[in-house]
């Protein structure tokens, strides 16, 4: 029964077991009300923490069950969450966090500044200092000069050392009269 424009609360989103008379929850407490008490309740504003469900008991009297609903507080985070960054922006953020930029790199300073390596760096030269560099038709074994003026390895440097030793061995065998068998060295002339 509704008085003064306040409708009586209706069980709209209640489970089927609650309307049929089944258990609601652990917090359900049945209380029977008289007609006078129902009139007073319908005039009051409903409590948002209490859900009332009207039920008929087998004796014909009207009972209500109050289900005490736990109050859930929804809080917003105090600090707004950062937006998802695209990959390039994330990489940029990572480079800024590590203090890297285009002017700073992980290479030693002598590489960036096009200066020769510091004297403390181990020498990578394999040629004999007495030879004075490359000679005419011989291929340069050892170092090459790079575009920035620094010295580096020749592309075939790792092979040249072993190849030059093999060539020296073949030349010495030719000069001594060919100690090896012709089948082992097909390039030798007999």
Curated annotation (Swiss-Prot):
Residues 1-21, 155-190 are annotated as: Disordered. This is Putative uncharacterized protein LINC02908. Residues 181-190 have a biased composition (Low complexity). It comes from the Eukaryota.
